[in-house]
């Protein structure tokens, strides 16, 4: 059944009637709901059900299994908290995972004092991994379950944001500075740390987000939103082709997230 318009369940639970009686469901039933972004979740029963005309059965509540954890970072720490457990008195009792960047000093080849100034921490690979960037010129990909550093580069000056791209490649937004690699969006391959495969100019680059539906990379910096498509992506020399630049009403763009396949949130 497809309703004539999407049903808004963000504020409260909603009852969705489905008319199928009379019917015998000898093996029970499964009800699957799909949201406007294509995420599906189900509720059901294995008990047999017989409905005569006019009868009804109410299923259990169907709840999305989308992650309700909040990830935030600053200084040398990354924290993951259960948003359902946190309250106005604090978050510490709700911490489910944390990472201290100084523990990766040897892997990064940096002094512990440079494993600091974290700017971005972004869950990727269905929440199994985490991309972390630092203004001290590095980016790392972590396995959340083990804390292992799966990829790192220290060639990303003033790295402010990163994003996973298809075929195990990573985009990094490198913000302002005097280095020739500042004010760029860089592309790396996970298997080849510290090797910049491609970079594109973007003044004060601060955010990168991949949209799987549109197959486009969105990047922000200064007063610009730049939209890239992938070019020669499976070759040894991939690149980002600038497709469009959108000037935003105000400058100083600092952060961006993908709300859904049709909506970006930019701050």
State where each predicted segment sits:
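Tryptophan-paired
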Residues: 1-51
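Short loop/turn segments immediately following beta-strands, especially the blade-tip
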Residues: 82-89, 229-237
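Surface-exposed loop and turn segments in beta-propeller and other repeat-based domains
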Residues: 92-114, 239-252
